């Protein structure tokens, strides 16, 4: 499969090309938007990867140009801009997906595979044809269970044929699909690779014409025999090729751990990163000279708009580069610089102290990083602990233990976080993702008499911070740890949104074990089905209920109620009262007449406020009744209350 990469960051180009070629993709690289248009409109590609900030023509404009000219090739945007506006702008321009730097190489490759499957005749994760099975995730190929040892080009050729199993490929098409635009092999080279691939397939037991030749046209996969197709399925009714593929795909993938890199491959990738960092570090330090000059010019009020724009591009590139190497903390500093430099207003001398602090911290972090550690490589599915603490000694003890448990940590200084969240400033953008659990370290608390005499502003701020995080992450467990275990402290922590309260001195191992136990018992998302004929209102519900972790299914047609109900098997049901053809009361009675659904919580939601209607709702088997308009938090709490009662009854 052939990919066009349009990116101007040399380090990112090197790392991305390494990952893509390892997974058997052919990559063409250009460094500006206009060249991206030239290549993309001249050669045929299976996927285009674009950075948003490009010289000559930005990625958004380039994406729009491709779509305006009728090009339907999948486009993946790759950028450091982690905000909703940028994502919406990119997707509206015609992009098919959006990945934020720093990215997990495994996730990026998985997204690429998903995009390529959409345009393929074979949309399944595993590619099969008769007794042949190719797993794009692991690049493994077997025939009738026997592994095939293929060269890179043989693998690429076989994958192309499998993804386009109904197509006859001419030699010219294969040359265009399988070789870079800079290579010019002959048709004899194609015939040689086909011949060697056929030989290996026949040696594994495949028919001689497994890869068939249509004279004058090209090469194609011959349809497998009926016996081969039936052998793929584990049940008599799954005799179709599509069903067989699904069955085999599920069986094979269920036995294989997901999103894991073999240790030897990971070590090779780590060695590659360190080798690349050795060459990149001096270049990054050289770029710091531009940022240091910005600080000096800012102090003397001599900064020009052109200099500020240039510095923003430097910070943007540094953020992307540092993210590639897993230097998350350093990347966050670069992102903050990019944010301030890219503001709508020109920087003033009053901003000089802030800029000097950020630039100095960035320079020191880059200078002190001599070796990329394994733990710095993007960790994929490993859980993220957000620790809100200003106690450096405590932080270091937790970091050491958490690393041994496979937990990633982000440390947030308490005074900076709550105000930023309350004013919607982008300080939290640097975290890149929502945490899985929050650990909050309370400051040293004075005695009650001292508090009465002189209120502790730091303690007041920490309680506000706790409440702020609890409101933003209502389903997220927050662990509070303090020096005192008095009832007043525990009560305040629970009122503000804390879930667990620990008292120092608690060993770091015990604290991390507490976090691990919270992670081991994640709540299964509650499935909620909502039936209402107001489609505009229905469209708002998934967003309204998202903070509570509900998996929402909406339905506007009462005639489809029973079919959707059985398919979704919800944990709770919300019904409108007045609907065309069948009203909510009738649907509730229908539900209660089936033993399987007699205990399903049913909430009625209606504009009708009269007591007669409400009494009728409870008479037909409803559990609750809400009047429109209703706020998302009220609806969510009513649903949660019904679910808690059902589960308490079941226990």
Curated annotation (Swiss-Prot):
Keywords (A to Z) from UniProt = Activator, DNA-binding, Phosphoprotein, Repeat, Transcription, Transcription regulation, Two-component regulatory system
Matching Pfam families: Hpt, Response_reg, Trans_reg_C
Q: Does the keyword Transcription regulation apply?
A: yes
The GO biological-process annotations, alphabetized, read as: regulation of DNA-templated transcription
Q: Name one GO cellular component term.
A: cytosol
**Which SUPFAM superfamilies does the record match to this protein?**
C-terminal effector domain of the bipartite response regulators, CheY-like, Histidine-containing phosphotransfer domain, HPT domain
* Database matches in InterPro entries: CheY-like_superfamily, HPT_dom_sf, OmpR/PhoB-type_DNA-bd, Sig_transdc_His_kin_Hpt_dom, Sig_transdc_resp-reg_C-effctor, Sig_transdc_resp-reg_receiver, WalR-like, WH-like_DNA-bd_sf
Q: Which residues bind DNA?
A: 124-223
Residue ranges occupied by any Response regulatory domain in the UniProt entry: 2-116, 384-519, 527-643
Per its UniProt record, what CDD domains does this chain match? REC_OmpR, REC_OmpR_CusR-like, trans_reg_C
Question: In the record, what terms sit under GO molecular function?
Answer: phosphorelay response regulator activity; transcription cis-regulatory region binding
Q: Which residues carry this modification: 4-aspartylphosphate?
A: 51
| Purpose | Required for chromatic adaptation. Thought to be a positive regulator of phycobiliproteins.
PANTHER family per the record? REGULATOR OF RPOS (PTHR48111), TWO-COMPONENT RESPONSE REGULATOR ORR33 (PTHR48111:SF1)
Q: What is this protein called?
A: Protein RcaC
Q: Which species does this protein come from?
A: Microchaete diplosiphon (Fremyella diplosiphon)
Q: Which gene encodes it?
A: rcaC
